[in-house]
Amino acid sequence: MGPATGMTPDKNIESPTAEKVPGLSQTENMGSLPEEVGAARPKASMVDNGATDEELTNLNWLHESTNLLNNFSLGSEGVSAGSPLYDIEGDLSPSGCQTPEKLSASSKPPYSFSLLIYMAIEHSPNKCLPVKDIYSWILDRFPYFSTAPTGWKNSVRHNLSLNKYFQKVERSHGKVNGKGSLWCVDPEYKPSLIQALKKQPFSSALALYTPPTSPTSVSSRPYVLTSASRRKQIHYVKDSDIDAATAMMLLNSSIKEEALDRQKPQPLKVVLPKKRSYASAFKHCPPLSLQENDGEVINIDPKEDHNYSASGGDSQRCESRSSVSSLSSVEEVYEFIPKNSRTGSDGSEGFHSEDDTDIDYEEDTLGDNGYVPQPSGNDLHGSKLRKEASQDIDEELKEAAGSLLHLAGIRTCLDSLLKTAKAQSHKHRK
């Protein structure tokens, strides 16, 4: 096989043997290299003599281009937008580098918003800035944000309000005139911000963004990041931004849940005590228990909620007063009359409800036989409650009887007055 035709006249390379052809064809068919190969080989030419097995590529460009592998990134298709092979319009630049103006305008700074806010505040003479001045500082130092969507301003505000690194300052400590709040760095969390800034892979940017020692350093132009430092910064995790975003999401979700809980009514099931026999009406006085759907008993503090009574005795008193004063039915009145007043001369009880159980009848028979149980703490407490309830009932009955007697007296007086008036009228007629 003769020398390959179509080569450049100043390069004479013998054609490789047939064993090297498969390796060259694999290099030619690689899917992740075509655009980079076409951009970085200025002297490459193709061999075209009509046969597919004789089409060989000049490989001199591999020795001339030394920065080829630096432009590749694993897991990406083609060339990334921040690659030095691209300019602002996206065209391939043959020089393989960019000017600082093009880089600063097209690339996003590798700092988190908390670090940007920290640097802006530290560059101020009073170490405190309003939100508008923070915006202007970021726009002056990083022209990328002048063409970026306006959502970055919301991120700055969220970091100021939700991040623990920053706090509001009283207006007297900073600017006297103007509107809006002043923000400064919390001294407690300032070392952590400095440590996060030291983790940046470029030392020159660190030297520039440390707090200034003179007013001249405040007005100095910031360091423009190179493409290599930007590629190193791609894998940097912005912890503070993630924390601020998660805090904002949690805040929104908690507000929505509270609004839904307020709108949704919570039904409470009132569990009334089981109806007992009239003999044991005052033996057990359990207070009414309010239960939710899950069956748990709600313990309500009387100091917090004034709609509920503080003890079971008070609830029994309220219940007894309402039932006696209303006089809705004979059973309700009879249920609150003491046992001694309900027993007859022969010691027999009055009528019983149809819902009484066998246990209630057993308790009644024990009470008729004169069996006295041993006193305990619960019995003493129940006896106190019964005494108080009976005293209240007696007072209510006395008041009702007095009112009835008063009405009866008024009636008798009216009757007597009418009789005397009729008698006098009869006398006058005669």
Curated annotation (Swiss-Prot):
Location in the cell: Nucleus
Domain of life: Eukaryota
GO biological process terms held by the UniProt record: regulation of DNA-templated transcription
Residue ranges flagged as DNA-binding region: 108-204
Regions of compositional bias (Acidic residues) in chain numbering: 355-366
Pfam families recorded: Forkhead
Chief subcellular location: nucleus
InterPro entries tied to this protein: FH_FOXN2, Fork_head_dom, FOXN2/3-like, TF_fork_head_CS_1, TF_fork_head_CS_2, WH-like_DNA-bd_sf, WH_DNA-bd_sf
Molecular function as annotated in GO: cis-regulatory region sequence-specific DNA binding; DNA-binding transcription factor activity
Biased composition (Basic and acidic residues): 381-390
Keywords carried by this UniProt record: DNA-binding, Nucleus, Transcription, Transcription regulation
One cellular component (GO) term of this entry: nucleus
Xref: PROSITE patterns: FORK_HEAD_1, FORK_HEAD_2, FORK_HEAD_3
Region called Disordered, residue ranges: 1-47, 299-326, 338-391
Protein name: Forkhead box protein N2
